[in-house]
């Protein structure tokens, strides 16, 4: 039986790295992520990407459970590089490979300055799951 190797790949942003940890189904809430972005600019919150041992993409569903009050979050498909992740470990033989995954992208309302907050979770076809609580400072 093939076992999925998974990684959560982050975009360029300020703040501590995302530690993917489940906070639903009775698991503890992960530490919040703190990011900063210019008003109206796109900010990649994460790049959930999962693959099998042959480096083929494994599906992943992303659900925004608490949308931001002053912006939008979109989930778009995109190529992501298989890199190590603190939770899921080494990418194995797929390290450095471009694999089709998703990107979770935040954009504030035009002209908004202040704080925003979003919660989302993802689940792969293989049952890997994580949740993120993101505090966003918009300047």
Report the location of each language-model feature.
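Bacterial N-terminal signal peptides
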Residues: 7-17
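Positively charged n-region of N-terminal signal peptides that target proteins for export
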Residues: 1-4
């Amino acid at each position: 039986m093939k076992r999925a190797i998974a990684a959560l790949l982050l975009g360029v942003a300020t703040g501590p790295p995302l530690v993917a940890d489940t906070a639903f189904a009775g698991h503890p809430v992960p530490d919040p992520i703190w990011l900063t972005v210019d008003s109206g600019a796109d900010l990649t919150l994460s790049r959930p990407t999962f693959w099998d041992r042959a480096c083929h993409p494994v599906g992943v569903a992303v659900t925004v459970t608490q949308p931001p009050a002053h912006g939008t979050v979109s989930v778009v498909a995109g190529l992501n590089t298989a890199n190590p992740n603190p939770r899921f470990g080494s990418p194995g033989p797929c390290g450095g490979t471009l694999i089709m995954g998703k990107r979770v992208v935040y954009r504030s309302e035009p002209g908004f300055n202040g704080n925003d907050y979003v919660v989302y979770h993802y689940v792969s076809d293989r049952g890997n799951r994580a949740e993120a609580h993101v505090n966003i400072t918009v300047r």
